[in-house]
Amino acid sequence: ERCTSSSRLLVQDTIYEDFTARVAEVAKSIKVGHPLDPETVVGPLIHPEHESKVLSYFAKAREEGATIAAGGEKLGESGCYVAPTLFTDARNDMAIAQEEIFGPVLTAIPFADEAEALAQANDVQYGLAAYLWTRDLDRAMRMTDALEAGMMWVNSENIRHLPSPFGGVKASGIGRDGGDWSFDFYMETVNVSFPRSHHRIPKLGG
């Protein structure tokens, strides 16, 4: 339940099977538990209604043809604990790729080349955060110019410098918060003029 956590993972098709298998193993090893436990990585969801919403996407994923490679279940009898979940064999037009699930889920989608990766990345109504991993600086410059997101991290996880601007594009909002942008976000600029001395107002007409 972190707004800037990416829920879609676009992976080059030539490494898709191996990469997602490794991600599945990592997902299975993540400790879910009480948020005050120092060993906990993922805590509970905030409310039973939201837990029900997140759990409902597991059935949707299967109905649309995706595979649940890890997780896909509620943990324990009490509390709103959901196992970290990886969806594979997914397409970008599936509900698990197009809708905000806001849970411990990741949808892995293959792409063939840079153009397809960009098209899939931008083919959603949201645009808060994006992450790009590449060894090619020219590609990084091209992609960050074209990605439709308010915040981007290149070869980095989400580490935000608080004075930097925060905000999204498209259905993820308008405006920026953070640093000097905070003042603009909460204020309306108004121009008020006062004469500094007496002056004659020009007479118009006869």
Label for each model-derived stretch:
Residues 1-91, 154, 201-204:
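ALDH superfamily catalytic-core signature
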Residues 31, 58, 74, 81-206:
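Conserved C-terminal structural/oligomerization subdomain of aldehyde/semialdehyde dehydrogenase
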